[in-house]
Amino acid sequence: LTVGGKQFEADGDPDTGATDYDITSFQHIYVVGAGKGVQLVVKAIEDVLGDYLTGGEIICKHGDPMLVKKVHVTMGSHPTPDHGCVEGCQRILNLSSRITENDLVFTVIMNGGSSLLTCPADGITLEDTIEVTRLMQIELGVTTRKLNALRNHIDKLKGGKLLRLFSRATLINLCGADLNRAFDIGKTDFQYLVKENYWLHNVPDGTTYEGALQTIKEFNVEERIPASVMRLLRSQSPENASL
């Protein structure tokens, strides 16, 4: 459900319907995620699962109070990322290397996850990523939709790539959105979400490399975007999405 909005309908989702999980059948149960309100969700998971929860890694905003005990919290910056964001992502990457088919993993993405879940792609520096956000969103006022069409493709985790890391495990993907009537996404089903998604990074991405280049061209900033970013975008198949 969206707060003050219409209900999400899972029509068209091949996995629609209630699912039962025998939590005693899993060797480990982890939580990973990022967002300004992610601790509220993770605390609820901790409260429900108790000792069945092994641990996990989440990234929150600097200044957030500590609400969770079993899951490790890394603090990062929003709206422009910092080294804390990268450190938290590296911890998620490290955790993913230990995951097996006998594990259950909750992924949780909340508002602010696009900044907090920042792990620059090979050849891209954190400073490059910061400059993209500063230029496009802070200076030029580009919408988050158009900004993410760009930064989803210069990152190791955004744009659904988080799912690949934990694909060996059984996954439960929780998507949170704090929306109001002024930002009502309307009646949304699964197929529309997958096609249009640009900010829920534990759902397949709906943006493309071609869309990223179009956004840069639209704002006439080819010469201002870091050269490493332009090289990466131009080297990829134009129509490919992140996942």
Mark where each language-model region is.
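Non-transmembrane, aqueous-exposed alpha-helical and coiled segments at domain scale
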Residues: 1-108, 114-243
